[in-house]
Amino acid sequence: MSKENLNIDRINELARKKKEHGLTNEEAKEQTKLRRQYLEEFRKGFKQQIENTKVIDPEGNDVTPEKLKKIQEEKHNK
């Protein structure tokens, strides 16, 4: 199992425990930390995916937003 899956499993485990019994201070801090890490990784992956996307209309024209084209160009020139 990947580290990400283990983190999701632990986040879910802590969420269930919070609903059923509540969390200790340490568990609440762990939950916050794991959620923050998960969101950070999710956002990073999503940003990479968007930055590598090209939008083509039904006629085959590149209609990628200019802002995205500029970001892609800057990354390509590095």
UniProtKB/Swiss-Prot annotation:
Pfam families hit by this protein: DUF896
Cellular compartments annotated: Cytoplasm
Gene3D superfamilies in the cross-refs: Helix hairpin bin
InterPro entries per record: DUF896
Keywords for this protein: Cytoplasm
Gene Ontology CC annotation, any one: cytoplasm
Signal peptide as annotated in the record: none
Composition skew (Basic and acidic residues), residue ranges: 64-78
Region Disordered: start-end pairs: 53-78
Homology family: Belongs to the UPF0291 family.
HAMAP family found in the cross-reference section: UPF0291
Protein's name according to its UniProt entry: UPF0291 protein SERP0911
High-level lineage: Bacteria, Bacillati, Bacillota, Bacilli, Bacillales
